[in-house]
Amino acid sequence: MTLDLAAFARDKSIKYFMISYTDLFGGQRAKLVPAEAIADMQKDGAGFAGFATWLDLTPAHPDLFAVPDASSVIQLPWKKDVAWVAADCVMDDRPVEQAPRVVLKRLVAEAAKEGLRVKTGVEPEFFLISADGSVISDQFDTAEKPCYDQQAVMRRYDVIAEICDYMLELGWKPYQNDHEDANGQFEMNWEYDDVLKTADKHSFFKFMVKSVAEKHGLRATFMPKPFKGLTGNGCHAHISVWDVDGRVNAFADKEMAFGLSAQGKTFLGGIMKHAPALAAITNPTVNSYKRINAPRTTSGATWSPNTVTWTGNNRTHMVRVPGPGRFELRLPDGAVNPYLLQAIIIAAGLEGIRSQADPGQHYDIDMYAEGHLVKDAPRLPLNLLDALRAFDADEGLKAAIGAEFSSAYLKLKHLEWNAYCSHFTQWERDSTLDI
C-alpha cells in the first residue's frame, strides 16, 4: 500500500516537502512544496523546465514532472518540519528514459525477471574543508599517515557524531565512522540494502553531510581529488545478489574459490569485461582521473586502482573479494551518481551472466609495488575522454543500460570534456610561455 504523503505530513507535523531528483551530472534538483499541496503533487508530480538541468532536454520540450516515490520519504532529522522524497522523472505521462532513477528502476526490474535481487552497500568518502573550499578545516590534521587518527576524528566529533546520530534515528544501522587516509577526510558506514534503497540513501547522505557541515560553518566535498598529494575520495561499492525473496545469497558457495558461486563469478566477469567503459559512469568527471592515475600520495598509497584486476582480501586491486558471497568494487569515486552507480553495476553484471563472462586470472600481489609485472591486464582510462570513448565503443554495455540514457550521457559528457579542453590553465602558461 502506497504511503499517503498528506497523512504523513499531518502525523509528523511536516510543513514542506523537498521533491528531489538527480540529473545526469549527479546534481540534486528539488522544489520545496508546502504540505497543503502535496496530495496533488503525489499524484501528478512537481513541474520543472527540463532544459534547466542536465538531462539532455531542450527549451522546446514540455514540462518535466518529478513524481515523488512515497516509499523514499525522509523527515529531515535536523529540520523536522521538512521532509525529503526522491522522485521519478516523467514527461507526457511517460518515464524520462535517461533520468538516473528511472534507469536504475528499469534494471532492478530486469534483474527481478531473471530471479535476482541485487543488494549493495556504499562507502562514500568526503573531506571537511573551509567554507571557501581552499584548505582542510582542521589546521592540526597534519600527520603523514592520518588514517584512523583518534585525535583528528574527535576534533570533528561535533560534525561526525551529529550525522551518525541522524542515521541512527533514520534506522540506517550505521556501524562505524573513521578518519580516512587523507588529512581532513572521513568515511561513515551504514548497513547494505536493496540497490534502489541504497541509491536513495546515498543521495540523501550527500545532502545531509553537506547540510550538517554548513551548519557548523564548514563545507563537505565528495570531489574525487580535491587536494594534490592527498588520497582522493572513493565510493567503494559492496555487491551481492540474492534470490527475489532476498533470503538466499546467489553469490555464496563455500565449495568455490573465495566463496564465490559460478553465477557470482560470471557477474564479476561482466564487471571485469566492461571495466574501461564502466569508468565513464563510476568516474564521471575530469577530476576523477587525477585520483585513478595519481602518483604516490603523502600517506604512501592512493587506495585507488589503475588496472583491471581482481583478488581476494587485498585492497590494491580494482575488485576485492573480502569474504564469501560478495565482492567490493573499488573503482567508483565520490563524484559518482548514486543511481547510475547501481545501474551500471547491474547492467554489467547481468550482461556478464548472460554471456557467461570469465573474470579472468586473479592476482595475489601488491599492485602498487608489483603491478608492473602484470602485462596482460587492461589499464583503466587515462582521462575522461578515454573513458567516454570506451563506453561509446562498448555496444553490449550501452544496450544493457539503455540506448536513450547512453546517447544523452555521452552527448553531455563530451560537451563537458570540450569545455575543459578550452579552459586555459596556469600549467600551460608556466610550461610554454618562454618556448
Swiss-Prot record:
Q: So where does Mg(2+) 1 get bound?
A: E123, H236, E328
Does the UniProt entry include the keyword Kinase?
A: no
Q: Its domain of life?
A: Bacteria
Chain positions recorded as L-glutamate binding sites: G232, R291, R315, R330
Q: Which molecular function term from Gene Ontology is one that the record holds?
A: metal ion binding
Sorted alphabetically, which SUPFAM superfamilies does this protein's record hold?
A: Glutamine synthetase, N-terminal domain (SSF54368), Glutamine synthetase/guanido kinase (SSF55931)
This protein's name: Glutamine synthetase
What is the protein's species of origin?
A: Rhizobium leguminosarum bv. phaseoli
